[in-house]
Amino acid sequence: MKISLKWLHDYVDVTEFFQKPEVLAEALTRGGLEVEEITNRAKDFNHVVIGHILEKDKHPNADKLSLCRVSTGEGVVHQIVCGAQNHKAGDRVIVALPGAVLPGNFAIKKSAVRGVDSAGMLCSLKELGLATESEGIAILPADAPVGKAYAEYGGYDDVTFELKVTANRADCLSHFGLAREVSTLFGKELKVPSSELKTNGKSSKSEIALDVKAFDLCPRYAGRFLKGVKVGPSPAWLKARLESVGMNSINNIVDVTNYVMLELGQPLHAFDAAFINGKKIIVDRAVAGEKFITLDGTEIALNGAELTIRDVNHPVCLAGVVGGKNSGVSDSTTEVFLEAAYFLPMSARKTSRSHGIDTDSSYRFARGVDPDGTLRGLNRAAALILEVAGGEAYADHHDFYPNPVKKAPVDITIKTVSDRLGYEAEEHKFVDFMKRLGCEINKKGETFTVLPPTFRFDIEQDMDLVEEYARLNGYEHIPEALPALAAAPSFQDKTFMLNRTTSELLRGEGFQQAVNFAFVGSKAQKAFLGSLEALKATGLAATEKEIRILNPLNEEMDVMRSSLSFGLFKNLNHNFHSGNMQGRLFEIGSTFFVKDDGSFAEGSRAGMAIWGRASNLWNKSLDYPVVYELKAAVEVLLKSLNISSYTWVTPANKSEVPEFLHQGQFAQLLVEGKKVGFIGTLHPLLLEDNKIRVPAALAELDLDQLYKGQPRPYRIQSVSKFPIVERDFAFVMPKALKVGDVLKDIRKAGAGLLLNVDVFDLYEGEKMEAGKKSVAIRIWLQDKNATLQETQINETTTKILESLKKNFDLSVR
C-alpha cells in the first residue's frame, strides 16, 4: 500500500520526516509495518520551475522552431528554443533548466539548436512523466508564481512509502489509519478529518428505500441520497492526491469515493439513482445462476452464495467487491445513492476468490473495516461530493445497524505482562500505551480491564495486549538474557530411538523413506487388502471394522489405515508409472484397529517395498526373485536388533495369504515362535491390473513385537583371522519343495564349520522338466581356530549332501 507523507501530514504532524523519511520508515518497521520502499518525488523535478514567456520570435534558421525569452524570477531570463506551437508571449510554462533529468534519463544542458544557443526546455506533461499523451507544452494558469519549483506548485514535493501491511492490521490500510499508528508510536496529537455535512433539511425516504435481508452477512448498511450533482473532471488537488499514491482519476464522483477509502479506510460505492429499479436497495444473497455484468463489462454467473446489492429486478453490485455496469455513475448522472457498509470479511473474501475479482474495496473488506466508521466515511464522502460536483444532500440517511458490534473486554495484570516479556513492565507506561491505542481502561485491584476499539480486530486476548506493550515500548528494549536451563538428565524415548536406528539401517540398505497419510479411503483400502483375517494371521493386529473419521477431508480419506502395505503399493505404482522402473521404499508408522472391547488402538509397523529386477547388480542374475532381496533386507534388520531366533514359515492354508500377495511366494516371519509379519511377491493379477510390468514385493513387520526386550544383549566374538571357503551346489527339486526347509537342513548338517548359506540362483525355464526347479546354493565354511584342511571341507560337504539325499532325495546336478 502506498502512503503520501503530505497527505499523512493532514492528520498528524510529520514535519521532521520530510527531510529524513527513513527515520519514520524505521519506526514503522519496528512497530510491525514494514516499509518496503521510499520514493522522494521531488527529486524527479529538480531544476524544474515555473517560467514566464516574455517574448516569442521565429527561429532564424528553422521555420518550425520558435525562440523564446523566458523569465524564471529574480530578473533571470533564459533564451530557449522550442518546437511546440501552442504557446505565446505572456504564458506561464514549465521550464526544465540545465541540470534537470527528465524521465528516460534525458538530461537537460545548454546546447545549440540549429545554430542558436538554448538554455533549457519548455516541457509538456508527457515529457515530465505526468501524462501518457500531450498536445504541445503545458500552459499553466496566469497566476502561477514565476520561479517557484514546479514540484511544490504541482504538489509533487512529496515522499511516498510503500508499506507491507500484515493481514491483522487492516486498521492501517488508510492515511488516517496510519496517522493513528504514527500518533500512537510517537505520542503525537491526532487530527480527525471533518465529516460535517450541510443538508437541504428534507427527507429522502421516498427517494430510495432500503431492505436488508441478509443481515447475517451485512451487520451494518448506510446510504445517502444526493441530487443535482454534475459529473466531470476532478479538481487538481483531488487528482494530485490520488496520483500521489498511484491511482488514476476517473471523474469527480468516483474519485471522491476512492479518496475517502484511501483517507479513512472505508470503501464506498456510488450508484446512479436513476437506474435503481423500484427506487429500492435490497441487500440479499444472489440467485444461483443469474448473470451479473461488472463495471468493466465482464459477465459472470453467480452461484447463490454471494452477497449482492440489488434493486427490485436484478443485482447492481457484488457487495464489497465490485459495482455493476447497469448502475454505475456516468457523465449524465445527476442523482447519486452513496453506499457505506460493514460486510463480514468472510463474505467479501469468498466472493472475491470465487470469481477471481480483486479490488481495493475487496482487499479492505476481506480484512475487516471499522463498523463504527461507516457513517463517518459516508458523510465525509457526501460533503466532498457537494464540494467538487455541486448538488444537495438530504437531511436524513439510511443506517441499518440492529446489533452494534461490540468488542469483548480483556482482563490483564501488570504481572502477566512482565512474566510474558521477561522484564519488569511499568504500570504508567501500560496505561499510557492503552490510551494511545484508543482503548478504554479501568483498574480493579491488580487487574486492568481493557476495552479495545472496534477498528482493532487483532486485539482479543491478554497476549495481544502484551504484544502491544512490547511493540510500543520497543522490542530493542527487551534485555538480553541467557535462558534459564535446568540441569536435568535428558530423556530419550526408546521407541523413537529404535525407529531412528531402523530408518538409518534401511536407508543403508538402499531404501528411501516414504511418508503417507494415516487416513485413507475405505473403499480403496478394502479393495486392495481384501479380508483382514489373512493379515491378522500374519501376527499383525487388524480388524474388519474400520475407524472412521468424523470430519474427513474427502471420501478418499475417510478412515484410519489398517496396514502400511496399501500406502506403499500406491507409492510403488506412482513411481513405476513416473519412469522409476526399479526402487526400494520403506515406511515406519502407525496402523489403527478396533479392540475387542470396542476401543481404538494403534500399532507401530515397518513396511518395505522393492520393485524391478536386479539386472544391474553384478552378483544377481536377471531371474533372481525380488522377494529374496526383501527377505535379505529383513534379515539384516533382525540382525541389527540382535534377533537370531527367527524362522520363515509358509502357511499350509492359503486363506492365510493376503489377497494382494502371490500364494506361492509368501512367508510369515516368526520371532521366538511368535508371528510378527510377512514378506511376499505382489499378486500377478494385481500387477497386471495396474500395468506394472516388473516384479514387486512387500513386507510388513510389527515393530512393537520386534522392539520387545530391546536392547538385547550382544555376544561379543573376535573376528576369525582364518580364511573362508565357499562351495556352490545346484539341485533339481520339486517346485513344491520349500527352499527354506532345504536351507534349514543344510544349517543343521553343517553345524560347526558352516558360517552361512544362501540361494544365489533359481531356474524354472523350458529346459526343466515339468514340476521341477533348479536351485543354486552357496555355503561358506570357516574354522575359527585354524586354516581349514581339504579333508575337513570334504567331510562337512559330504554330511550336507547325505542329509539332503536322505531327507529330500536331492542330488547335485
Swiss-Prot record:
It is an enzyme of class 6 (ligase). Residues 405-480 form the B5 domain. Its EC number is 6.1.1.20. GO terms for biological process: phenylalanyl-tRNA aminoacylation. One of its GO terms (molecular function) is magnesium ion binding. Its main location: cytoplasm. Keywords: Aminoacyl-tRNA synthetase, ATP-binding, Cytoplasm, Ligase, Magnesium, Metal-binding, Nucleotide-binding, Protein biosynthesis, RNA-binding, tRNA-binding. It comes from the Bacteria. Mg(2+) binds at residues 458, 464, 467-468. Residues 42-151 form the tRNA-binding domain. CDD domains: PheRS_beta_core, tRNA_bind_bactPheRS. SMART domains: B3_4, B5, FDX-ACB. Its cofactor is Mg(2+). GO terms for cellular component: phenylalanine-tRNA ligase complex. It catalyses: tRNA(Phe) + L-phenylalanine + ATP = L-phenylalanyl-tRNA(Phe) + AMP + diphosphate + H(+). Binds 2 magnesium ions per tetramer. Residues 720-813 form the FDX-ACB domain. It is found in: Cytoplasm. HAMAP family: Phe_tRNA_synth_beta1. Belongs to the phenylalanyl-tRNA synthetase beta subunit family. Type 1 subfamily. Tetramer of two alpha and two beta subunits. This is Phenylalanine--tRNA ligase beta subunit. The lineage of its organism: Bacteria, Pseudomonadati, Bdellovibrionota, Bdellovibrionia, Bdellovibrionales.
